[in-house]
Amino acid sequence: MGKRHEFTEPNWDIIQGGMGVAVSDYRLAGATGRTAAGMFSGTAIAEVLSRRLQDGDPTGEMREALATFPNQAIADRALIMYFQENGERPDDQRLWYRMMPMFNHNTKETSITADMAVLGAHAETYLAKQRAGATGIVGMNLLTELDRPNMHELLGAMMAGVDFVGMGAGIPDQIPRVIHDIRHGAGVPVGHNVHVRGKGDTAYEMMLNPERYAPDYAEMSDPAFLAIITHHVLAQRLSRNEYAPDGYVIEAPTAGGHNAPARGRDLNERGEPIYGERDIPDLQKMQDTGLTYWLAGSRASNEDYMDAILQGARGVQVGTAFALTQESGWDPELKQQVLNTISREEGLDVYTDTLASPTGFPLKIGRVPRTMAERAIYEVRERICDLGYLRQAHNDPDRPGKIEYVCPSEPIDDYLRKKTGLSKDEIADIVALRESTADGDLSLLLKDASIEDLTKTHIRKFLIAEGQTEGRIH
């Protein structure tokens, strides 16, 4: 397909990055979208809408947005199920929010889970566009890794006129085709393959019937698609697809949030991945192929912007700086605490943790006191899988043809059993071995000639389940 978007508007000089769950929300995206390209986070957007309604929707904006949804029967059902006048709460904090059913491979088109994903993205887009104004540019950020609700969120955002979609945390090779099918399919059901891990990797197809939500396709936007990547090789590969991205955001390893794994195996003394020459994208090759791209990661100054332009970029993407603004959805007290820490002489200690994220991607951690960056606070947090957005579908080894879900926040014994396929006794043996090693480093035992091969196999499975990538296990 030919090039669909030229990105000539001055707003495209700066893209405000999508962050977290409602950190970059409609307020921030609407404010930045007036003069830049504002992007809100679509991550868990159904849950965001649900909780705002259960908090009593104090500004009235959620109900305002829902009143614009084309199918009012769907909007009314959401209000009946989740809106709480004045945000009234029971005494038991565990019962503060009514939980939605989780997205599964068998989630029906008519389920409240699917409806809330469409409604949430529609509401967030509508409110951001209202704030950005007629000439503003507003986009939605999605994560490839959180694949089950993405198709429904795309539909909701497109119904409300979203201008672009940015997507990383994986290889988003299906999404340009999904956007095309939603926009030009005239109500024909749209499919999207979801990966099922385990022996004999397979996929199942999530289905979406746009006509249930959007009977009038004339009002549907045709957003630009930006793939968020780290290397020119992936850009070249994606650009050869029939439905290719319209542009690319190239993130350096210094970018906040998740990073791509380093191509080398070495770690520094803090356990951080060491990025080398092989991790540096060849921007000349991007220019030679005529691809439009933005640079991201430590690009928040005017000098950084000018340097990006000299390297052939259309502009820059900036995230963390916007997370600290008044308009971001970050908790105000935590935001101020981070700002206070940054302002001190020693600054904020930020490091790249290879194990912290259940996605398997390295993750930036800021050592902020009294948060889960402190091990003691993390350890006392109850492990419960009540949201399930990061669950992974696995082929059940004990029930051929069946799918089970592995949730990184479920009780650790259940998680390790599902992820490794080991028995409780085998897991207990590995835990005992860990306690006997220096610094609890199981990977040292993989080089120990006295350890049986079968035990080493179990250790590898255990380490992979805990989050270490196979490439780092020697």
Regions inferred by a protein language model and the residue ranges of each:
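Hydrophobic residues within well-ordered alpha-helices
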Residues: 32, 308-309
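Active-site entrance/lid segments in N-terminal catalytic domains of soluble metabolic enzymes
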Residues: 1-288, 303, 461-471
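Conserved active-site-proximal phosphate/metal-binding subdomains
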Residues: 245, 253-292, 300-303, 310-474
